[in-house]
UniProtKB/Swiss-Prot annotation:
Similarity section: Belongs to the glycosyltransferase 25 family.
EC number(s) per entry: 2.-.-.-
Alphabetized Pfam families for the sequence: Glyco_transf_25
Keyword Transmembrane: no
Superkingdom of this protein's organism: Bacteria
Lineage: Bacteria, Pseudomonadati, Pseudomonadota, Gammaproteobacteria, Pasteurellales
Protein's name in the database: Lsg locus putative protein 4
Keywords, sorted A to Z: Glycosyltransferase, Lipopolysaccharide biosynthesis, Transferase
Length: 257
């Protein structure tokens, strides 16, 4: 049976009520998110490499971002310690602002019946308005739909490039969770929870994306992070100019794997 984890701050009762009002959520195990907002920076520096974060991302980390990373890592620890989860099996991790597509469970079941060939499967994305938003294809293209693998009502494939997709909902293999835990047993974490490019390049943890999405952030909720990350929106013309090259990269990446 698929293990499902919901990351939620203890104070966010209404968020959990909204999440659990959705169908197929009764089997989620709630993990109390690590609240870093009241900790001082010296305390945080003891458990998170603030200086390495700044060197890597060229900016200061926020307390909320540290809490987010530590919370996801703590869930990975639980996955690793769970003897009921096989090394090559997936667990589902969601945040409490997750809004599921009406056919979420049907498509999730279909996905899990496939040989997905990636350690992380991004079922959703943050800061997106719709499950099949136009920006998904323009900014984060995959290969041509007829070359994608299809199951249920969704396609899955490698994106043209791993990117910051948020952590609203994803599948992760136990073997990948173990790799994260091995990393932090040697050095303090310094990364953002959704730096999938770093995970691919440094930890050899690959990810695939699902199109259309089956999870998005609930639009009635506002993120707990101190600041919303993400690049400034480019105008449509600039996006369209970059699109053909991104599409070529996506096609090559999927043909090579």
């Amino acid at each position: 049976m698929l293990k499902k984890y919901l990351i939620s701050l203890d104070k966010d009762i209404q968020r959990r009520e909204l999440f659990f009002s959705q169908k197929n959520t009764e089997d989620f195990q709630v993990f109390s998110a690590i609240n870093t907002m009241q900790k001082d920076w010296d305390e945080l520096a003891a458990i998170f490499n603030i200086e390495q974060f700044k060197a890597h991302y060229f900016r200061n980390v926020t307390k909320g971002e540290i809490g987010c990373t530590l919370s996801h890592l703590s869930v990975y620890q639980k996955i690793v310690e769970d003897n009921d989860i096989a090394e090559d099996s997936y667990a589902l991790v969601c945040e409490d602002d997750a809004l599921f597509h009406s056919d979420f469970q049907q498509n999730l079941t279909a996905l899990l019946s496939e040989k997905l060939e990636a350690e992380i499967i991004l079922l959703g994305q943050s800061k997106i308005n719709d499950f099949n938003d136009f920006d998904l294809e323009i900014n984060y293209p995959t290969t041509f739909s007829f070359l994608c693998k299809k199951t249920g009502d969704v396609n899955y494939a490698f994106p043209y490039k791993s990117y910051f997709a948020g952590t609203v909902g994803y599948l992760i293999k136990k073997s990948a969770a173990r790799r994260f835990i091995q990393q932090i047993s040697q050095n303090k974490p310094f990364w953002l929870a959704d730096d999938f490019l770093l995970f691919e390049q440094n930890f050899n943890i690959r990810n695939k994306v699902v199109r259309p999405l089956i999870v998005i952030e609930n639009p009635v909720l506002i993120s707990n992070l101190e600041s919303v990350r993400g690049s400034l929106s480019n105008n449509l013309l600039k996006k369209l100019m970059k699109y053909p090259l991104k599409k070529i990269f996506a096609i090559k990446k999927n043909l090579a794997n």
